[in-house]
């Protein structure tokens, strides 16, 4: 029963879409209506508002961090263990990808996954974030950086901690993140992928395409 409660609460926390909420609060267009069409920080940045993008990034990372951190640090007193941590991690991530509050149409989960990893272990989280930053800095492709981080996160975890149940959750999240970027992979191969900082087109009413997002 405890793990079911963990799953439901974590999923609902993950279902809060900061991209939509922040954009609405700041009088910006709905991020689902331009650019990649995905509610994430990278797409919000295409609105031209760095402040909104930063707030979205922080919010999405925080919601991933919160339930996992709580279970890691306070779970034992409620009979929770590493399995509960793994459940919280996957549930909050799924909440971001398929949010109940926004018709199950969410972002791609990079910032939320980063928050989850930081909660599991700060060293693991920082190593994965550095991977994203290095690739993003040299290529300016958010999607390519996300894919690199998704590949290396389970590797970093294996080197740091060896086999454990939480590693399975990390593999699941990484696999889902790569799956959510399948459109980006195709666009990268065609040389059509949007770069970080590209603004939305003047014809914002045009149908969104599958661009990068965090």
Swiss-Prot record:
Lineage top rank: taxon: Bacteria
Keyword vocabulary terms for this entry: Cell inner membrane, Cell membrane, Lipid biosynthesis, Lipid metabolism, Membrane, Phospholipid biosynthesis, Phospholipid metabolism, Transferase, Transmembrane, Transmembrane helix
Keyword Acetylation included in the entry's annotation: no
Compartment annotation: Cell inner membrane
A GO MF term: acyl-phosphate glycerol-3-phosphate acyltransferase activity
Transmembrane annotation, as ranges: 4-24, 52-72, 82-102, 118-138, 159-179
GO cellular component annotations of the record: plasma membrane
EC number assigned by the record: 2.3.1.275
Membrane topology: Multi-pass membrane protein
Record-stated family: Belongs to the PlsY family.
Function field: Catalyzes the transfer of an acyl group from acyl-phosphate (acyl-PO(4)) to glycerol-3-phosphate (G3P) to form lysophosphatidic acid (LPA). This enzyme utilizes acyl-phosphate as fatty acyl donor, but not acyl-CoA or acyl-ACP.
Protein name: Glycerol-3-phosphate acyltransferase
Protein source organism: Paraburkholderia xenovorans (strain LB400)
Name of the gene encoding the protein in the UniProt record: plsY
């Amino acid at each position: 029963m405890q793990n079911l409660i963990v799953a439901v609460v974590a999923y609902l926390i993950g279902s809060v879409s900061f991209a939509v909420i922040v954009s609405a609060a700041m009088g910006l267009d709905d991020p689902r209506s331009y650019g990649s069409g995905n509610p994430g920080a990278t797409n919000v940045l295409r609105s031209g508002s760095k402040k909104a993008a930063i707030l979205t990034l922080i919010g999405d990372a925080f919601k991933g961090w919160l339930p996992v951190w709580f279970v890691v640090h306070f779970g034992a007193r409620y009979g929770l263990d590493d399995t509960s941590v793994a459940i919280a991690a996957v549930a909050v991530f799924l909440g971001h990808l398929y949010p109940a509050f926004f018709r199950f149409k969410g972002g791609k989960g990079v910032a939320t996954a980063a928050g989850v990893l930081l909660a599991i272990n700060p060293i693991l989280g920082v190593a994965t974030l550095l991977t994203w930053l290095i690739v993003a800095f040299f290529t300016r492709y958010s999607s390519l950086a996300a894919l690199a981080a998704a590949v290396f996160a389970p590797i970093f975890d294996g080197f740091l901690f060896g086999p454990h149940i939480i590693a399975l959750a990390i593999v699941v999240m990484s696999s889902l993140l790569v799956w959510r970027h399948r459109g980006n992979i195709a666009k990268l191969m065609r040389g059509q992928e949007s770069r970080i900082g590209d603004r939305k087109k003047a014809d914002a009413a045009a149908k969104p395409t599958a661009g990068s997002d965090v």
